[in-house]
Design a protein with these regions (language model features):
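Residue-level preference for alpha-helix termini and adjacent loops
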Residues: 7, 18, 40-42, 54-61, ...
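Glycine-centered flexibility sites
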Residues: 30-32, 96, 114, 145, ...
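Intrinsically disordered, low-complexity coil segments
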Residues: 36-40, 48-51, 126-130, 224-228
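HotDog/MaoC-like acyl-thioester-processing domains
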Residues: 1-13, 63, 80-168, 242-245, ...
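Catalytic-pocket segment enriched in acidic/His residues
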Residues: 189, 194-272, 276-277
């Protein structure tokens, strides 16, 4: 087993990254904003009358890569599957800016047939040195378990026994993955039919983080009235691939003041993003 379970606590070197107004607009279109051209203009345009450009909160996932996976030892990247993703917004993301990011390995768990590695990335805005957002992701690495280590904490999540308080449905476009990849994730699994076939798919699949972005838009509008300053964070567990062109339905239950849980379903009703939570200013 080439990965090192003792790498917990290892940190990456600080890295800097920047983005522009154009990057924010492209990300928004990449997660479906603008399909109704008169809606969401604050996220899809920079020059509409009496509208100030804003940044979708989930854009945090494509900014600042400092995961620290280079600290855990050797493994086959093809065996890595993105399992969970969370973001915590400390304030609104500006339309353009530069951040410094440090990643830390916060957990390595033995799942028998594989290992789960948890990484936290903290990003600060270079202009003032203050925190902007924190991201946590977990990855399942097949074939790297079996050393007798801790299996990790169990996630406590319960779907309320009632109809959703809010339901939002979006349609992904056939070329959605080709648009989303322009925000940085050029994995050929999402564009190259030959590569997708090697993974057992008959055509390229949508990025999991694109599904995450669509879901974040749904939460933003249903819970925050479209106001990005009220969106504080979200978590979700990837449970099934999505194909471009599918509908995505976000079922949302309010559970407390400023808190909600959700599930996102594909067009056939299967759950594609599970055990979701969202925090916001009510």
């Amino acid at each position: 087993m080439p990965i090192n379970p003792d790498a917990v606590g290892a940190k990456s070197d600080p890295t800097r990254s920047s983005w522009t107004s154009k990057d924010a607009l492209l990300y928004a279109v990449g997660v479906g904003a603008g399909q109704s051209p008169l809606d969401e203009l604050q996220y899809t345009t920079e020059n509409s009358a009496d509208i100030d450009q804003k940044v979708l909160p989930t854009m945090a996932v494509v900014l600042g890569f400092g995961g620290g996976f280079d600290k855990i030892g050797d493994f086959n990247p093809a065996m890595l599957v993105h399992g969970e993703q969370s973001i915590e917004l400390h304030r609104e993301i500006p339309v353009s800016g530069e951040i410094e990011t440090v990643g830390e390995i916060t957990g390595i768990y033995d799942k028998g047939k594989g290992a789960v590695v948890v990484s936290e990335s903290r990003s600060t805005l270079v202009s003032d040195g203050e925190p902007l957002f924190t991201k946590t992701m977990s990855a399942f690495i097949r074939g790297e378990g079996g050393w007798g280590g801790d299996s990790g904490p169990a996630l406590e999540w319960e779907q309320p026994d009632r109809d959703p308080d809010e339901t939002v449905t979006y349609t992904t476009r056939p070329e959605q993955a080709l648009i989303y990849r322009l925000s940085g994730d050029r994995n050929p699994l999402h564009a190259d039919p030959t590569f997708a076939a090697m993974g057992g798919f008959d055509r390229p699949i949508l990025h999991g983080l694109c599904t995450y972005g669509f879901t974040g838009r749904g939460l933003l509008h249903a819970l925050c009235g479209g106001d990005s300053s009220k969106f504080k964070g979200m978590y979700g567990r990837f449970s099934s691939p999505v194909f471009p062109g599918e509908d995505l339905t976000v079922n949302i239950w309010r559970t407390a003041d400023g808190e909600a849980v959700y599930q996102t379903q594909g067009g056939d009703g299967r759950v594609v993003l599970d055990k979701g939570t969202c925090s916001y200013t009510a």
